[in-house]
């Protein structure tokens, strides 16, 4: 079995959420390779996190669930995945 690289789009609850604190919380929750900011509108900025996980059943869902538990996160959605 190999690994799967996934891109997760993380939406904060509001524009007032501290993005740097949110990035730190994301890095603490899952093994992140990179985080990029994506402006949405009206001051809201989503984060896109690149995460590499083992290619096993449920691994991407575990990452998504861990990110949704972070305070200040409205949603976390896998938007892309590929084998590496």
Swiss-Prot record:
It comes from the Archaea. Transmembrane segments: none annotated. InterPro entries: eEF-1beta-like_sf, EF1B_bsu/dsu_GNE, Transl_elong_EF1B/ribsomal_bS6, Transl_elong_EF1B_B_arc. One of its GO terms (molecular function) is translation elongation factor activity. Keywords: Elongation factor, Protein biosynthesis. Pfam families: EF1_GNE. Promotes the exchange of GDP for GTP in EF-1-alpha/GDP, thus allowing the regeneration of EF-1-alpha/GTP that could then be used to form the ternary complex EF-1-alpha/GTP/AAtRNA. This is Elongation factor 1-beta. It comes from Methanoculleus marisnigri (strain ATCC 35101 / DSM 1498 / JR1). The gene is ef1b.
């Amino acid at each position: 079995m190999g690994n799967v690289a996934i891109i997760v789009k993380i939406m904060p609850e509001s524009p007032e959420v501290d993005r740097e604190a949110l990035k730190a919380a994301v890095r603490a929750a899952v093994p992140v390779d990179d985080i990029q900011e994506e402006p949405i509108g009206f001051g809201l900025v989503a984060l896109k996190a690149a995460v590499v996980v083992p290619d096993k059943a449920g691994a991407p869902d575990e990452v998504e669930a861990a990110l949704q538990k972070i305070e200040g996160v409205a949603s976390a959605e896998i938007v892309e995945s590929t084998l590496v």
